[in-house]
Amino acid sequence: MNRFSKWITDFLRPPKEARLDLGRRAVIGAGLAGVGGKLLFGVAPEASRRTFNPALIRPPGALAEDDFLARCIRCGECMKVCPTNAIHPASLEGGFEGLWTPVMVTSLGYCDYECNLCSQVCPTHAIRQIEVAEKQKIKIGLAYIDRSRCLPWAYSKTCIVCEEHCPTPKKAIWFEEVEVRNIQGEKLTVKQPRVDPELCIGCGICEVKCPVKAPAAVRVASVGESRNPENQILLTNDSYGQG
């Protein structure tokens, strides 16, 4: 290689500090996108209403959405300590303001009933510190049965997996014995699962353990979460008819 060619090669070669691997570059870019979105769009008034999404399930102890977005610095500490891989960075579940903030993805992991680690490591208290006993009473969402996919409902097959794994002291998933007929016209008694919205905390273990996959026959949505009294599936006597 002559001196001119070497000079051209050296000139075109990026500096060492610019040679990032794609994995690191993606992580840094995503982090900057989250921070940039926060700076560019800010936390809009009543962001939680405007960006409501059933998939926007925050970890237990998360503040009300506007306060949460104002405090969360997208550090990822809660994601790192989650033992069941349930907490992941948000894409657009919470709008641009919520980029890279932590959300529960209950198709991938569940909130362990005996765990409160995410609340212990949050440096800004966007997820407030809570003891396990308090955490166990916080509703982060509500499970619901997809009757078109559930084995007892759709196929008259016996399955009690969701109820077996439900961790609440009084099971949030219970069964009703129903007499049905199979395709041959024979009478069968099957146990069809139901969800008690008063007892369900939305932990997602039923979704993870469900033998039906992609998607599961029981899934969790953010409706019913403790942190937002307006995000409820049921009308109470006090709220009925009020604007």
Predicted regions and their residues:
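Non-ligating segments of multi-cofactor redox enzymes
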Residues: 1-243
